[in-house]
Amino acid sequence: MSPPKNLKKFERPEVTPRRNISLLSNRLADAGGWRIREDVLERDYCLAWFLAALSQSDLKPILGFKGGAALKRCYFGDDRFSEDLDFTLLEAIPMEEILRWLHAVYREVLDSSGITVAFDREDRHKHVNSYTFYLRYTGPLPTGSDAKVDITVREQVVFPLAERPILRGYDEFVDVPENRLIQVYSLEEIAAEKTIALFDRARNEPRDLYDL
């Protein structure tokens, strides 16, 4: 039996050209005198797509987006580049369940952008109060890379979470949707966490001061 004539075959979009990443790197260098590496810009682009897909998944109501990446992606959209994504678990769910639900997120990213994202490995260090693992992604550049995801299991959130759109960040990321909402920590909550982190000698992250 042949398919209906008006049924269109699904065509997966191609990944945004590497040229777009190169043009963005050149534009930022011309504007500020500092060239951002293409692999850093690619990570920013791929993580934007991951968050956009996450916002449409069953994980949206149980994860609170936080940290420096949340400041950039949901509040300011500036040139603050993160190597990881931080969340807080809002419901008691085992890591295995989260990893299973993430398969739908990977599929959405691939079908909508052509970017390949997949679970890579758990963090080699033991974490008492967090699920920490790495994602492997392949985007516009020929070689893939990874990004760290840290999900705090138990944390007292003082201020109400906000539901905010995921910012595209740059005009060159034209295919990243901007009308998708995600649960994110309030500015007050993020500022409080960053202030506490400044006094944590074991942490030693200069970005905490920059974010404030």
Predicted feature residues:
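N-terminal, well-ordered alpha-helical segments
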Residues: 45-52, 61, 69, 83, ...
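Helical scaffold of the NTase/Pol beta-like nucleotidyltransferase catalytic core
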Residues: 2-64
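Catalytic cores of NTP-dependent nucleotidyl/adenyl transfer enzymes across multiple folds
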Residues: 2, 26-34, 44, 48-52, ...
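Short histidine-centered catalytic/ligand-binding loop motif
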Residues: 35-36, 86-95, 198
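Short, conserved acidic/polar surface loops in the N-terminal third of protein domains
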Residues: 74-78, 98-101, 145-147, 161-163
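Metal-dependent nucleotidyltransferase catalytic core
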Residues: 89-125
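Active-site nucleotide-donor binding segment shared across nucleotidyl transfer reactions
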Residues: 55-85, 91
